[in-house]
Amino acid sequence: MREYKIAAIPADGIGPEVIAAGLQVLEALEQRSGDFKIHTETFDWGSDYYKKHGVMMPADGLDKLKKFDAIFFGAVGAPDVPDHITLWGLRLPICQGFDQYANVRPTKILPGITPPLRNCGPGDLDWVIVRENSEGEYSGHGGRAHRGLPEEVGTEVAIFTRVGVTRIMRYAFKLAQARPRKLLTVVTKSNAQRHGMVMWDEIAAEVATEFPDVTWDKMLVDAMTVRMTLKPETLDTIVATNLHADILSDLAGALAGSLGVAPTANIDPERRFPSMFEPIHGSAFDITGKGIANPIATFWTAAQMLEHLGERDAAARLMSAVERVTEAGILTPDVGGTANTSQVTEAVCNAIAGSNII
């Protein structure tokens, strides 16, 4: 029996609702498979923890997480806690502290979901966005001076290192190489940002020589939004900076129907530390407690987690079940359905148990 230790951090808003659904689905997969077991420990860190203790997680939080094989994360953010506190107090310390430098966000249109793009046919939108997750625009460098005065100044310093850009570029090329189309698009803004972004372009060209079977091209980030919208079929694997990929992946989720179906994996490719898996939809306090949160993104990121752990059959079984359920029209309101979180979760669990799934 293969056994794994998972740290669950439901955190804020709909996070507890979708993580509970994800754990239910993982249990269904365990029962169906019979050859692996997941041991889960749940941590109450997040905005409520902050209101009680003045921090989003305890000082030894990373030490507590090191013993786990993976981290299953819900969402962070609350209306009554500043966003920079919630983000820099929990999610980013985990990503940066564990050097989860590859943020991987697959996007495709699932069966039964009608995308907003009128002329987007089956298979036209099937992408993976690779986001540099350790530096760049979210390095945390900068400051403010002369606070409250007319001459107040605020600076945000983007930091790009050769080692950081090279490793994410190599990761993206390897991923593109493993996909059927072997196609990579490198996104920058190197016409206007003439230092770090030009270095990105140069390193992309250097790394490309290691992957002669991968076709690659370059796009400026503003033009990329147009290409994603009007010519989705021309894209496959995409790599971009921390900020650019953050924005583009939200657009990708919307083009696929909803952020409620968009997953992400924060990967330490060298496996020195646990990687973290989460939906990208955020805390969504406008629907918190209503029971209508879309759990599909959480199921998809659970599949990413299983694949990372080496349970490829279980990951494939989960995604097959998800696609059967969406194709049957069992959908939450954000993608045009009338089902609630529990109904979608139950349907996926039933599909996992069914004999017609892998």
UniProtKB/Swiss-Prot annotation:
Pathway note: Carbohydrate acid metabolism; tartrate degradation; 2-hydroxy-3-oxosuccinate from L-tartrate: step 1/1; Carbohydrate acid metabolism; tartrate degradation; 2-hydroxy-3-oxosuccinate from meso-tartrate: step 1/1; Carbohydrate acid metabolism; tartrate degradation; D-glycerate from L-tartrate: step 1/1
Q: What induces it?
A: By tartrate.
Tell me the cofactors it needs: Mg(2+); Mn(2+); K(+)
Looking up Pfam families in the UniProt record yields: Iso_dh (PF00180)
Keywords for this protein = Cytoplasm, Lyase, Manganese, Metal-binding, NAD, Oxidoreductase, Plasmid
**Compartment(s) of residence:** Cytoplasm
Family, as annotated: Belongs to the isocitrate and isopropylmalate dehydrogenases family.
Protein name, per record: Probable tartrate dehydrogenase/decarboxylase TtuC'
Q: Which organism is it from?
A: Agrobacterium vitis (Rhizobium vitis)
